[in-house]
UniProtKB/Swiss-Prot annotation:
Organism of provenance: Aliarcobacter butzleri (strain RM4018) (Arcobacter butzleri)
GO molecular function: catalase activity; heme binding; metal ion binding
Protein name: Catalase-peroxidase
InterPro entries registered for this protein in UniProt: Catalase_peroxidase, Haem_peroxidase, Haem_peroxidase_sf, Peroxidases_AS
Position(s), cross-link Tryptophyl-tyrosyl-methioninium (Tyr-Met) (with W-95): Y223-M249
Gene name per UniProt: katG
Pfam families found in the cross-reference section: peroxidase (PF00141)
Origin organism lineage: Bacteria, Pseudomonadati, Campylobacterota, Epsilonproteobacteria, Campylobacterales
Length: 735
């Protein structure tokens, strides 16, 4: 009989395991503000002073790679290596770590090591990758904090490829581990693993239109269903799914074929028996499993008896050797549909040659047929993929180079610009998807120059509001998810940003001409000292904020660090950058259209992508309003009579009980504030504006900034948050 808890609970505090009724249960539409406070130092055992790049520089990189190479063929009884080589397992681990990335919001990917944590550690498509990470643990234990899990998983994939004969394109470290699940990532609404598109809360609508920003076709899959759409073995329709999914992961058709064929050159699928024999995923397993899952009761449960995807067999006859055999086999045979021992759809060649039979993974004396998945068959039957497959088949070196480059892109897409790269194997070549910025080959401006330029900027016709708006529009394109965007490069002057609707009110042709004139005059009067447009845009915003603070009575210098450079149109991939276009920006009261998500939800999402805390988000909104930095100079939320002065008027007037608020539209997306006594109109507001007086948590912080003793605090906090946003992409000064 269980003893009574001395604290008065039945057996434990129900809230420890979400057993009690929570705020979310009472108010299911409540905003999730926790995404603005995740990954705090309270969960990080390494502390706020830990400098990963500094630790990585102490790493004996060659020794680590040697240890990883040795591990590849050091088969363990508790999870024996297929064909005596763990390489294919580590490739799958690295691939699935990186493969969650999607271009829509830049989230997912390899850069945080989140495969260690829920939900990814328990996704059906990640079955048995827990074993791969356990195999790596002795090496992680040995090298400690000098190598993150995020970097180690990708490096293990690279070493695996090299150990099996592929010349890789390169590797960069710099991925920093997180220590709790990433709750900001939307994986879909389905409440069932691998739910098909006909089920409730499907990610598909219309004629198989995939919901944005999702890339995977089913909940719990990394890419597509290997058996075919919704498990239907149709290679042509599978090709359609593949093209959409890989495009949303920033891959074109050639990269898609290279990755599919290159990845499937190695290893095998596992479906030795009925999946009903497989136990629960790691998060659902008991204590004695110690974080492992998918423990199988089918015969030995490992080796040739392993059950993972349900598909059974290898693609090639030499699954631990880099070669062109994938195409040899795929393109040389007619294929027939069959089912694996686990009941999964797969394809086998008709009358295969002896040389195209594979050894059993744990018995070299036994020969088995090779297989293809429905997704593989798309590489042969989709007309576009088929042409690429044929070309790669005829040109093995081109294929090897294409795969090496695509693999590097896959595993580094969310790492950010090259200024963030660390380690001895960084490729010298600049790649367009890295959003390259030219190196600075001139002397940058000093403090004296900065003061001169600030005077010129403030005396121009742009004014405080326009200077602030230009700097914000440039810098706030940054996404901390994949470290893209930001002010460096001055891409606001280039396509596609120059033509974005969110920038239309800035009159960029005229505004940039003024800045270019200031830039040209300064540069022509100095021999080797120059100012970039990128620096000038940010400096203009900083100068305007500084003036606005002074006009509010506070003589506080706004920090500015020069060193940005100007990118060219040739260095800017227009289609790729289109994903950074804001559909809404609550900091400017901008929304491109009406969406199923509310404007306040979109604000929280934007703030999270800018890596802002709740106080930083609040102080920036309040400051931007009084600075007159709204989209199209709208008066929504401008609760002040002194526009351009950095005061706390937004909070003072929002929280003033003399004002009553009324919706002006049936949708309640705009409001007017009227004097409670006279009924006269005082202000107009958006949903975002009223959020800071409506939401209890946000109101609590807003009250701090509305206090009489917080005027200077508001200014200082705004400047700190502003400076943070201006420098979000300055990895060159963060190392």
């Amino acid at each position: 009989m269980a003893g009574k808890c001395p604290m008065g609970f039945g057996t434990t505090n129900p809230m420890v395991r979400n057993g009690g009724t929570s705020n979310k249960d009472w108010w299911p539409n409540q905003l999730n503000l926790k995404i603005l406070s995740q990954h705090s130092n309270k969960v990080n055992p390494l502390g706020s002073d830990f400098d990963y790049a500094k630790e990585f520089s102490k790493l004996d990189y060659d020794a680590l790679k040697a240890d990883l190479t040795a591990l590849m063929t050091d088969s363990q009884d508790w999870w024996p290596a297929d064909y005596g080589h763990y390489g294919p397992l580590f490739i799958r681990m690295a691939w699935h770590s990186a493969g969650t990335y999607r271009t829509g919001d830049g989230r997912g990917g390899a850069s945080t090591g989140s495969q260690r944590l829920a939900p990814l550690n328990s996704w059906p498509d990640n079955a048995n990758l827990d074993k791969a990470r356990r195999l790596l643990w002795p090496i992680k234990q040995k090298y400690g904090n000098k190598i993150s899990w995020a970097d180690l998983m990708i490096l293990a994939g690279n070493v695996a490829l090299e150990s099996m004969g592929l010349k890789t394109f390169g590797f960069s470290g710099g991925r920093v581990d997180v220590w709790e699940p990433e709750e900001d990532i939307y994986w879909g609404k389905e409440a069932q693993w691998l739910a098909t598109s006909d089920k409730e809360n499907s990610r598909y609508s219309g004629d198989r239109d995939l919901e944005n920003p999702l890339a995977a076709v089913q909940m719990g899959l990394i890419y597509v269903n290997p058996e075919g759409p919704d498990g239907v073995p149709d290679p042509i329709k599978s090709g359609i799914d593949i093209r959409e999914t890989f495009a949303r992961m920033a891959m074109d058709d050639e990269e898609t074929v290279a990755l599919t064929a290159g990845g499937h050159t190695f290893g095998k699928c596992h479906g030795a028996g009925d999946a009903a024999n497989v136990g629960a995923e790691p998060e659902a397993e008991g204590l004695v499993a110690q974080g492992l899952g998918w423990l199988s009761k089918f015969l030995s449960g490992k080796g040739d008896d392993t059950i993972t995807s349900g598909i059974e067999g290898s693609w090639t006859a030499n699954p631990t050797r880099w070669d062109n055999e994938y195409f040899d086999i795929l393109l040389s045979y007619d294929w027939e549909l069959t089912k694996s021992p686990a009941g999964a759809w797969q394809w086998i060649p008709k009358n295969p040659k002896e040389e195209h039979l594979a050894p059993a993974a744990h018995d070299k004396t036994k020969k088995v047929t090779t297989i293809m998945t429905t997704a593989d068959m798309a590489m042969k039957m989709d007309p576009i993929y088929a042409k690429i497959s044929k070309r790669f088949h005829e040109n093995p070196q081109e294929f090897a180079d294409a795969f090496a480059r695509a693999w590097f892109k896959l595993t580094h897409r969310d790492l950010g610009p090259k200024s963030k790269y660390i380690g001895p194997e960084i490729p010298k070549e600049d790649l367009i998807w890295q959003d390259p910025i030219p190196p600075i080959n001139y002397e940058i401006i000093d403090e004296k120059d900065i003061e001169i330029l600030k005077e010129k900027l403030l005396s121009s016709s742009l004014g405080v509001s326009k200077l602030v708006s230009l700097a914000w529009a440039s810098a706030s394109t940054y996404r901390d998810s994949d470290k893209r965007g930001g002010a460096n490069g001055a891409r606001i002057a280039l396509e596609p940003q120059r033509s974005w609707e969110s920038n239309s009110y800035l009159n960029l042709d005229e505004s940039l001409k003024i800045l270019e004139t200031i830039k040209g005059e300064f540069n022509s009067s100095n021999s080797n000292k120059k100012v970039s447009l990128a620096d000038l845009i940010v400096l203009g915003g900083c100068a305007a904020v500084e003036k606005a603070a002074k006009d509010a009575g506070f003589n506080i210098k706004v920090p500015f660090t020069a060193g940005r450079a100007d990118a060219t149109q040739e260095q800017t991939h227009v289609e790729s950058f289109s994903h950074l276009e804001p559909i809404a920006d609550g900091f400017r009261n901008y929304s491109k259209a009406k969406y199923t998500l509310s404007t306040e939800e979109l604000l929280i999402d934007k703030a999270q992508l800018l890596s802002l805390t709740i106080p930083e988000m609040i102080v920036l909104v309040g400051g931007m309003r009084v600075l007159g930095a709204n989209y199209a100079n709208s008066d929504l939320g401008v609760f002040t009579s002194n526009v351009g002065v950095l005061s706390n008027d937004f909070f003072v007037n929002l929280l003033d009980m003399k004002t009553a608020w009324y919706p002006t539209t049936q949708e309640e997306d705009s409001f007017v504030g009227k004097d409670r006594q006279s009924g006269s109109m005082k202000y107009s507001a958006s949903r975002v504006d009223l959020l800071f007086g409506s939401n209890s948590q946000l109101r609590a912080v807003s009250e701090v900034y509305a206090q009489e003793d917080s005027k200077e605090k508001f200014v200082q906090d705004f400047i700190n948050a502003w400076t943070k946003v201006m420098n979000l992409d300055r990895f060159d000064i963060k190392k």
